[in-house]
A protein has these predicted regions:
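Charge-dense, helix-prone N-terminal extensions
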Residues: 1-139
Length: 139
């Protein structure tokens, strides 16, 4: 789980702190949580409900272990191979938050350091997920 924290903490604007509910580490961007890692093998990530539904349908994540009807997802890290999946989900959450911040504030969160199109291409997101991003973008 240290690899997850060290990677996510390098993304522009991300702050890392203690997660109060259940222990672990929490990642925030502009004061809003983009996910947290529990001490065990569990990563929880908040999404807009539409994005969450796409991720569940694509079997990228599971419904949240405590709040299955919310926008949150859970992802279990059982081995080193699962770290990549956790990072993929956290990156999607980060990028979605950047897009919503840019739309709301009409500002470039992270400056030019975050190229949303290039990042989504690199993640190889599905058409459905890309459509969800496009719906909230500044046009």
């Amino acid at each position: 789980m240290n690899q997850i924290e060290s990677t996510v903490s390098e993304w522009p604007g991300v702050e890392v702190g203690s997660h109060d509910r259940g222990g672990g580490r929490e990642f925030t961007l502009d004061g809003r949580e983009i996910g947290h890692v529990h001490r065990g093998q569990l990563v929880d990530i908040p999404f807009a409900k539409r994005v969450r539904d796409i991720l569940i349908e694509e079997e990228r994540a599971e419904k949240h272990h405590v709040m299955p009807d919310s926008g949150w997802v859970s992802y279990r890290v059982r081995s080193d191979e699962d770290i990549e999946g956790a990072l993929w989900l956290l990156r999607v959450a980060y990028l979605y938050r950047v897009v919503t911040l840019r739309k709301r504030e009409e500002t470039q969160v992270g400056g030019d350091a975050v190229d949303i199109d290039a990042a989504l291409d690199e993640l190889n997101v599905s058409d459905a997920l890309e459509d969800a991003f496009n719906e909230v973008r500044v046009v």
